[in-house]
Amino acid sequence: MWSNVISIGKEYSKEIDYILAQLQCTKDVSYATEESEQRMWIYLASSCENVQQIENEMYRILSVVFLSFLKLRFFLERLPIHCMSYAKCVLISSMLHFDEAFEENLIAKTLSDSMDYNVDGLFNFRLRMLKESWEEIADVAARLLEGSDGDKDVFDIATFIAGSEGGKSRIATDGQTIDNITQRRRVEIVRLYDESEYNLIDAIVKEKPFEIYVTNKNLSDAMRGILKKIAKVIEKI
């Protein structure tokens, strides 16, 4: 029998909701929760024959927690963003997914070397190297934002941070779901924001598309406009 435990401070309510929702959809894993006034523990168990599969899934789930939820908190605390906009969402998404492959590998290595999954403990101590790198990106973005004038400047900053790497995938969205046509898979849309279109932007930026098929006429004008700045848009309505 394989077992482990995820522990996390209860102030991270969105992170907890995400972890529990993902565990409900994970095959061959049973779990139980325990909580105190300040902390939650999620006890995990599975048969030994599925250990590698289950651990890989835990790494994937916790990678999203570290590299989307906690990274977003980190940047919002350091950037002069007083009112969110579509352009600012693109900027933050570019920052969240910058150097993502390297960071995901680092997360997996850190988790594999850990006795348990103490989320905030790992984030504050074992992953300090990541936070130092994020601090540098946040400093650059903050300086550029202070001198920005409107959404065009904000989007230019996002393009600068994302680098010159070209788009990799053709994707399609109906405003509720996203499919990566090139890789033939459904794209996960993580609920980072209360505004659903911001979550859509984050998932789209992560895919690095060169072409976006839009099949929903009900997307807002602001959303349509920002998609056209991210990649070539083809409307199929």
Regions found by a protein language model. Name each.
Residues 181-237:
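C-terminal structured domains
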Residues 1-204:
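Conserved mixed alpha/beta catalytic, RNA-binding, or beta-rich assembly cores of soluble enzyme
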